[in-house]
Amino acid sequence: MKDPRDILRKPVVTEKSTSLLQDNKYTFIVDPRANKTEIKEAVEKIFKVKVEKVNTMRVKGRIKRVRNIPGKTPDYKKAIVKLRQGDKIELFEGM
């Protein structure tokens, strides 16, 4: 089994992800090879909460130009995790 800290890369803090906190949904960038079961187990193990549902999506990188040289930002995988009623992740509190 993979280390849970290798599966969860970093939390996503955007206006949309902050508004999802009201529905008890938390957003993370995760390892692209991780599946929903691994993401669920990682969140439960790291934050000591119960996960009800995991939604994942692959986000394509954008085309960028630096000094007229085209490049691309990396693709990544994003997971929206819904927690059981009453559970919270302290990392996101206070936003």
Curated annotation (Swiss-Prot):
UniProt-listed InterPro entries: Nucleotide-bd_a/b_plait_sf, Ribosomal_uL23-like, Ribosomal_uL23/eL15/eS24_sf
Cited Pfam families: Ribosomal_L23
Taxonomy, superkingdom: Bacteria
GO molecular function, one term: structural constituent of ribosome
Single biological process term from Gene Ontology: translation
Keyword Ribosomal protein in record: yes
Keywords, in A-Z order: Ribonucleoprotein, Ribosomal protein, RNA-binding, rRNA-binding
GO cellular component, one term: ribonucleoprotein complex
Tagged with keyword Ribonucleoprotein: yes
Subunit relationships: Part of the 50S ribosomal subunit. Contacts protein L29, and trigger factor when it is bound to the ribosome.
Protein task: One of the early assembly proteins it binds 23S rRNA. One of the proteins that surrounds the polypeptide exit tunnel on the outside of the ribosome. Forms the main docking site for trigger factor binding to the ribosome.
Classification via PANTHER family: 60S RIBOSOMAL PROTEIN L23A
Family that this chain belongs to: Belongs to the universal ribosomal protein uL23 family.
NCBIfam families xref list: PRK05738.1-3, PRK05738.2-4, PRK05738.2-5, PRK05738.3-2
Protein name: Large ribosomal subunit protein uL23
Species this protein is from: Pelotomaculum thermopropionicum (strain DSM 13744 / JCM 10971 / SI)
Gene from which the chain derives: rplW
